[in-house]
């Protein structure tokens, strides 16, 4: 049986077992493949007639709802899903995300997309290494970061109506900062889960997918806010 240390009142530094490094390697590999799949699907969608389908509001709404359902299924179905089902859901989500992101990417120049991706990759890499190696306990950051995400979404909705340029810039900066911090937080959380779990069979592969999803979401959201920050929209 897979068990977790659920004592949130006192969380001490965890001595990492020999199994931790291979699991983290799995996390990064799956996340990398997921990101690559997203990029391939987005490119294919933009270059084909699929972009017309992606631009359809009804289709886009259905795709977004499906994405939300997949994330919930992966996040809350850890103990119920097999590793094969979890892997399939993760890659289905990554592919569908490429389809929905194609419309967003089309609004920016190629140079802007490349610059934003490069900046995001460097920032993500640095913060993930920090989260993995730091001796500081980042646990308490989680609540504040989630509150920050909720507040950010609310402000973004408000700005849809007032369409403020300066506020949009602030939103972009804050968004990058929040998901930069979440990258370190989630990396440490995944590492601690790996060290605290009694790893048996399927649980190892499932943790790799679960961790990959967390870091994939951090990376994609950081990338989107970086795009907004750098700008360079096509006229």
Annotate the PLM regions:
Residues 1-235:
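A hydrophobic alpha-helical transmembrane-helix feature that marks the membrane cores
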């Amino acid at each position: 049986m897979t068990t977790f240390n659920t004592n949130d009142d006192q969380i001490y530094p965890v001595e990492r077992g020999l199994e931790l490094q291979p699991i983290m390697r799995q996390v990064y590999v799956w996340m990398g493949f997921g990101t690559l799949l997203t990029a391939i699907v987005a490119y294919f969608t933009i270059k084909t007639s699929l972009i017309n389908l992606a631009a359809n509001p009804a289709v886009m709404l259905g795709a977004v709802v499906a994405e939300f359902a997949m994330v919930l299924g992966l996040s809350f179905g850890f103990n119920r899903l097999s590793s094969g089902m979890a892997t399939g859901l993760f890659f289905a989500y990554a592919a569908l995300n490429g389809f929905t992101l194609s419309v967003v990417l089309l609004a920016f120049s190629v140079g802007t997309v490349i610059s934003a991706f490069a900046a995001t990759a460097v920032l993500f890499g640095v913060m993930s290494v920090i989260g993995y190696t730091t001796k500081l306990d980042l646990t308490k950051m989680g609540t504040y970061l989630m509150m920050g995400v909720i507040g950010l979404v609310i402000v973004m909705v408000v700005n849809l109506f007032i369409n403020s340029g300066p506020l949009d810039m602030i939103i972009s900066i804050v968004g990058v900062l929040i998901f930069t911090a979440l990258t370190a937080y989630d990396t440490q959380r995944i590492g601690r889960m790996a060290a605290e779990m009694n790893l048996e069979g399927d649980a190892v592969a499932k943790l790799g997918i679960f961790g990959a999803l967390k870091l994939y979401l951090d990376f994609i959201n950081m990338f989107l806010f970086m795009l907004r920050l750098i700008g360079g929209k096509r006229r």
